Amino acid sequence: YVISTVYMENDVLGFGQIKDRYQLALDLFDVRLMIEPEIVTWACRKATKEQIAKLRELCNEVEMLYKQGHNHIQKDIEFHSYLAKLSGNMVVERLIPVINTSVVIFANITYRSLMQETLETHRAIVNSIEHKDPVGAKCAMNMHLTYNRQVIMELLEKKKKVRKNHEPDDI
């Protein structure tokens, strides 16, 4: 299961040149933790009923694809991109390529290891926005990103151990 790198086409920040994909994914998640919880608080304030219905539809599509074993990445990117759009902030909308890069890199590294957590936190984000609950939306997004970040941290730790075990002794 290989995910296309077509999302790197707007690579104005040069992420495609970075060799350490694990560290890049971690750093991108750190940036997402700085930005996305605020995005959903703004979405709570600004989203219309029609927009919330579309967000729920995207959430359901991600879930259906994920559960059926299909590639859900494009829909997941649409979900997060739509959240950014709902914030009503044109700068945030232009930050979408950074967010999309993170989703693709993370999916390549972890391949479906957080399905249940992803589905539950996506639903919690949508429900919180629907109920105009910015604190709930922010908490759900923090949980979503923290689960993902933790997996990256564990993978980085394993990678470091493998490297250490393959280094010659300094005797």
Predicted regions, residues:
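Conserved amphipathic alpha-helical segments that form helical-bundle/coiled-coil interaction surfaces
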Residues: 28-108, 117-126, 136-150
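A glycine-/small-polar-enriched, mobile loop at the entrance of the PLP active site in fold-type I
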Residues: 111
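Short beta-strand-centered segments that line the small-molecule binding cleft or hinge
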Residues: 114
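Conserved short acidic donor-positioning loop in nucleotide-sugar-dependent glycosyltransferases
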Residues: 129-132
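C-terminal effector-binding regulatory domain of bacterial HTH transcription factors
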Residues: 135-171
